[in-house]
Structure formats: structure tokens, C-alpha cells
Regions:
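Short functional micro-motifs and their immediate structural scaffolds
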Residues: 18
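Long C-terminal interaction/binding lobes of large macromolecular proteins
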Residues: 6-15, 23-191
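Short, flexible, mixed-charge glycine/proline-rich loop motifs
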Residues: 1-4
């Protein structure tokens, strides 16, 4: 897969940002990656997340909608989520106290999953992370060995799926009018 990595780092304020844009083509099918996190080592799995990919943590009833693509880790996604949620909390505390409390509780639950800095093999509170990418361009690191018989990665799974017409429209593979009429060209039909 081809990606363009854009990275920014400000030497004055310390702000850093990395963003990924897919340079290659949209894949023939969408994909869903599922990772069962049980150790700190699982939190360090590399992730290439396209701008079409949403992330779900079912145990928290948390769904992170698709936004800018990035190269990160599971831990990085959770840390970014806490940072983004906390951004408006001081104002929200006075303007919408009930919403403030709910967001604060969610941030605490995410921090609980992040745990303390410990050894990579140290167990953490188990949870599942699901990446759903209709473009098929995201990737989650596979830590097993494909060649060896006993080296499978039992915590990692990938499932490809055919896209819906709505997903094809969102990806620019089909126009709105073609989707309404049930026609149009999708990548699956052309191959």
C-alpha cells in the first residue's frame, strides 16, 4: 500500500502532528480489524488508519468516527481520544454540567484501560478495539509469524467485506444518483 506521511513538529510549543493520506487506490473490499488487548505490548501495535476508518471500543461503548488518517498505536488512539474529549471540559463544566460529568467519566474509564507505565508483558484490563475501514486501506500490526505453525496471532483478526452503495458513494466510487437508481460502477463489479 502506498501512503503519504505528513509530519509537523513545532520546536517552540512542542506541538506534534502526523497525518497519513492514502496515495494508492481504494481496495476492492472494506475491512474490519479486531484486536483483543490484554497486555501493554498489545497497546503498542502499530496502526495505519485511513481517513475513512472508524474505531470502536465496545467495552466503553465508544465509537470514534472517521477523521484524518494517521500512523499510531492502540495506546495512541486512546490517548488522542482523552485529549480531544478534555479539550472543551473547562467551559463545559459551567455550561453543561451533566455532559461534563459524562465525558469526565468516559475519560476516567479510558485512562483505566491505558493503565500505568509498566512492563510490556504486564496484563492490562482486557478490551477489544475494532477498526472498520470501507476503503480497505487501514492496517493493524500482526505480531504472529505467518511461516511458523505455532506463531499465529490469536488476538488479531481481519475480515474483508463488500461495501454498501452508501459506502461507495462516500468513497467517491459511485455518484448519489447512481446509488439511488441501484446502478453505477463499484470496484467490486468491475473486476
Amino acid at each position: 500500500r502506498e501512503v503519504i506521511v505528513m509530519s509537523f513538529s513545532c520546536p517552540h510549543c512542542g506541538n506534534r502532528n502526523s497525518e497519513v493520506q492514502m496515495a494508492g487506490e481504494i481496495q476492492p473490499k472494506g475491512c474490519i480489524y479486531t484486536v483483543h488487548v490484554t497486555t501493554k505490548q498489545d497497546m503498542n501495535r502499530q496502526i495505519v488508519k485511513s481517513e475513512f476508518c472508524s474505531v470502536t471500543v465496545p467495552e466503553l461503548q465508544l465509537q470514534i468516527p472517521a477523521r484524518a488518517g494517521q500512523i499510531t498505536t492502540i495506546e495512541g488512539i486512546l490517548q488522542d481520544t482523552v485529549r480531544d474529549l478534555e479539550m472543551g471540559q473547562p467551559v463545559r463544566k459551567h455550561m453543561q454540567p451533566d455532559v461534563y460529568e459524562k465525558i469526565e467519566a468516559l475519560c476516567e474509564r479510558i485512562r483505566g484501560l491505558l493503565g500505568e507505565e509498566t512492563d510490556a508483558s504486564h496484563p492490562v484490563q482486557p478490551f477489544k478495539v475494532v477498526l472498520d475501514d470501507p476503503s480497505g486501506n487501514s492496517f493493524v500490526e500482526y505480531t504472529g509469524s505467518i511461516e511458523s505453525s505455532g506463531g499465529a496471532d490469536a488476538k488479531w483478526s481481519k475480515r474483508d467485506y463488500p461495501r454498501t452503495k452508501e459506502q461507495n458513494v462516500a468513497l467517491g466510487l459511485m455518484g448519489d444518483a447512481a446509488a439511488e437508481n441501484g446502478g453505477g460502477f463499484s470496484k467490486d463489479e468491475g473486476e
